[in-house]
Amino acid sequence: MSSTKPFAIAKRSVWEAYQQVKANRGAAGIDEETIAMFEQDLSKNLYKLWNRMSSGSYFPPPVKQVEIPKAKGGTRKLGIPTVSDRIAQTVVKRIIEPVLDPIFHPNSYGYRPGRSAKQAIAVTRKRCWQYDWVVEFDIKAAFDQIDHGLLLKAVRSHIKERWILLYLERWLTAPFETPGGEQVLRQRGTPQGGVVSPILMNLFMHYTFDLWMHRNYPQCQFCRYADDAVVHCGSQEQAQNVMQAIASRLSECGLMMHPEKSKIVYCKDSNRTQSYPHVHFTFLGFTFCPRKAISNTRRIFTSFLPGVSADALKKMRAAVRGWRLNRQTHVALAALAKLYNPIICGWWNYYGAFYPTAMLDLCMHIDRALERWARRKYKTLSGRLRAGVQWLRKMKDAEPQLFHHWRLIGTKVG
């Protein structure tokens, strides 16, 4: 590290950031350079990045804009930085995260070390049993609408290194490059897909929502995961007041509550029997609603519980169709299990953690796909629907541990 550089950035920091980016993989940016291509001249590329960052001459390239279809229509815009820029952002993130994360509210769960979406679902489930009413709200295009002035004000109150402030501002204003090659300047927002974007979103929402809620409505518990949040209230009147106040607060900070995706929900169950039009909400891929449950004494009752959402099931079924098993008839059943079990296991570990009975639809969908595969692979089963079903049943009896979901079919309700 040269003492003549304006900014003291250790070469080791760049090296460790590169290792982290490599581990996370990720797509190429506008230069179409992959990690493998970057590594062809690794020492030179890392030195060039360190030299520019430590001299203050690093300017982020435009961010590649990719539109991802949403489950209920429309698209979500993602910004994909180049490999080199992801390394630069990771250098900064590794420095600011230990400073910023400790100030965040305990009810903030998104993109934080040691915290997860499953923890957010667990705490929300518990609070739905304690509070009768929930305010579910959606922030319209939150990542795209963050006010740069307010965000940088928050950053400067915690981060003092000039070079970090310099590069954060440059990243915020780096243009998007559309699929058509047009470069679009940005005056608001932080690209969803950037390395530093999640922690910047958390900082912005800490002051916009978390701290504001803590000061103004300490009696109302909430759970926030990035730009997705729910608030628990003791009465319908309180929920109405809180929802109106949140909408006003978001507007003050340059954000907008989505009127069609925000509502008040009644947590209906066997003990809470009021009539109300909204008795379900979806949070982090789980739908919370009245569901049948079994007590320790084997009594059936209605509880307000989270289970995999219809949209999440739809995406998983689409993924199974994307496997195109009917084109893999040259492969043995055990090979299919080895190939797809990691995916099925990942789905179960998350969505099957709460009310696993709701995942039976996916299990049956996978099995139907395997039956079609068998009828296509074996001539003796061709065109015989029942024969395919019987064949798969025999396979389950012979090797009940072969596919991950076969081991879990017997999981109890609730």
Model-derived segments and spans:
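A conserved non-catalytic segment of reverse transcriptases
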Residues: 173, 253-328
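Non-catalytic, peripheral interaction segments enriched in hydrophobic/basic residues
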Residues: 336-381
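Conserved polymerase palm-domain catalytic core
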Residues: 52-67, 71, 103-268, 280
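A glycine-rich phosphate-binding loop feature that marks nucleotide/adenosyl-phosphate handling sites
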Residues: 225, 262-270, 340-343, 361-367, ...
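Extended C-terminal regions of large enzymes
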Residues: 365-369, 374, 378-414
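Core structural elements
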Residues: 9, 60-66, 71, 172, ...
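Duplex nucleic acid-engaging cores and interfaces of nucleic-acid transaction enzymes
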Residues: 84-88
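Non-catalytic, polymerase-adjacent accessory regions of viral genome-replication enzymes
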Residues: 1-43, 47
